[in-house]
Amino acid sequence: MKKYLFITFLSFLLNSVSLAEHANEPYEPNGWDKFLVKGSQNYYKFQSELVEDKDVKKEIDNSQKTGLISYLLFEDNKIKIDQENLPNYIKINNGIMPSHSVGKSLVSYVLGHAICEGYIDNINITLDDWSVLDGTLYKGQKLIDILNMNAGDQKFIGERKFNSDNKIQDVRFLNVNTFPIKDAMQLDILQSTKKSKPVYNYNALATNLLMNYTIYKTGDDWEKLLNKVFNEHVRVKDEVWFHQTVQKYNSSIHPRETGRYSFYANRYDYLRIGKRILDDWNNDTCTGKYLKTIYEQRISKNEKSYDGDRMGQFDIHTYSKKYGGQFHFDVIGLKKRKILGMSGFGGQQVIIDFDTGRIIVVHALDRHYNWKKIVLKKLKQK
């Protein structure tokens, strides 16, 4: 019990800036230690054939109300819609914007590369070789069940039972995004736990587990792998990074197991990521095979309602019926189409339609834009 109190109190003191409700997450691209990847000199160059879209323009022009600050639509191998109204504080940071939970999907994408590079055998392995999980319900589970948010952890964390995806049993200062995962797993509240009946349960701990397991398996090659994914494979133009769970002044205390899914990139590099995923799928690369495998093993969300969130707002998260490998699938009304969705707090969206070759990338300060009009309507076009 003393250990539990000490760790949680220390976490509260060191990370008080970021322990507000998830809905009030501040813009802080440089406040935390990073796993940083530099831009490629051979970055992917887009072609454009721009058209004006009145619906998108209206939402962008009214960004103070809608929250929409960036919209990109890519199809026919060209950027067709490109509109933005970035605040100055984002512009002076080279247009860098947070992924929020879009980063969950990017962790999976990196994990797929780790499998392709031979660091991890496959998605069906059992997690019995990592001491960090000792004593917890996660020890001995299959990797695919963690990928699918299907680990039977709903009594302890997640949106199935609690009001947050990142706080253990909804306790404000037990935010798994703000202290190393080994510390989280050693808390009394997670020790000697048993899994419940598996059910889709969206939460941040599963993703941070995946990321730190990948760090563990890659060892000294972790940042080399990140460079291979984003610099060499995606060919980003500018710096991108994952935040760590420790702030800069505190990073030396925890040299390992500090991975978290919070990702930063500019708008065009998010599109480059989407384009690379589209190409992986279409060209049946090793990573493309990974994406197809998690698509085949996706599970039902079994939500009571698909009528938006508690505020009546929609996105790919709330308007899709299945989940696989940290991605949203089976958009309502389009379930026959192979559409992969990434979704983050505040309306961040990266959506890839493998059947049409269309990619939509959206960034917002909050989710009050008309998602059905500027995203879903575009997806329905053939």
For the regions a language model picked out, list residue spans one by one.
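Structured C-terminal helix/loop/strand segments within mature extracytoplasmic catalytic/sensor domains
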Residues: 21, 339-382
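Active-site helix/loop module of the DD-peptidase/beta-lactamase fold
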Residues: 117-154, 191, 205, 218-260, ...
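N-terminal leader/targeting segments and the immediately adjacent pre-domain N-terminus
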Residues: 17-92, 116-121, 148, 216, ...
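Active-site SXXK
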Residues: 77, 97-123, 146, 210-214, ...
